[in-house]
Amino acid sequence: MQSWRQQGSIWQLRPRQPQGLIEFIGGSYLAATPQVSYRRILEDLCDAGLAIHAWAYVPGFDHQSQAKEAWMAFRQSRRQLEDRSGVLPPPLRLGHSLGCKLHLLAPDGGRGSHGLVALSFNNFQADRSIPLLGELAPRLGVETEFSPSPQETLRLITRHYIQERNLVVRFGRDELDQSDDLLEALKKRGADNTEALQLPGDHLTPASAGLRRSLLGAWADDPKRVEVIRR
């Protein structure tokens, strides 16, 4: 397997003859270094013959703008890959937590993808995602919310997200998961082939074992949980 390379905001991992492409966006606190935070799951996908493009970013309040930024970065990297390896099938978009939301807000409405795998969809309000903000904002007399807001995000998904092929994955002990809200928004569309899958684990299950060891100790190396990560 080839080593990770960074091109702008995209971390790339490519087999010698890629059979397809994964475009990945991670979640808050993990997204700045996806090649580390999600190393295991992404390298396993590369071992299966898929090129990996992972967007590195620091989450902000304007999620609509960041969704466009990610989409444009992926498009540029995909063109460069196809110049080298030939035309590939449409990419599969893979997101974790906030990364799911950013994929769902992409300017093309999912049109340019083969489908979306949404791991642990998360769409909380800003004061829930950033606890300190919830304490300081009232004292400062300001109102701060993500753009689009959680409610508007779900409306935009129903109205503008056109990709029919979606797999919504939730983990049994994930207290941050809001997949039910996403499924409801997707099912309201005229055409939908979305499927749901529940697996054992929690919100950090998609993250690499190395990061999870630092957060959770030996618990992260439970063989059953490692198998879930590989699945």
Where do the protein language model's features map onto the residues?
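Short low-complexity, flexible loop/linker segments enriched in glycine and/or proline
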Residues: 62, 66-71
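The feature captures the conserved acid-bearing segment of alpha/beta-hydrolase catalytic domains
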Residues: 14-16, 115, 125-197
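Catalytic active-site module of serine/aspartate enzymes centered on a nucleophile-bearing elbow/loop
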Residues: 211-231
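Short, surface-exposed "cap/lid" segments of acyl-processing enzymes
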Residues: 2-59
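Short acidic, S/G/P-rich loop/turn micro-motifs used as interaction or catalytic elements
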Residues: 28-31, 59-60, 99-100, 123-126, ...
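Catalytic histidine neighborhood in serine/cysteine hydrolases
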Residues: 189-215
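Short hydrophobic segments within beta-strands
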Residues: 24-25, 94, 119, 169
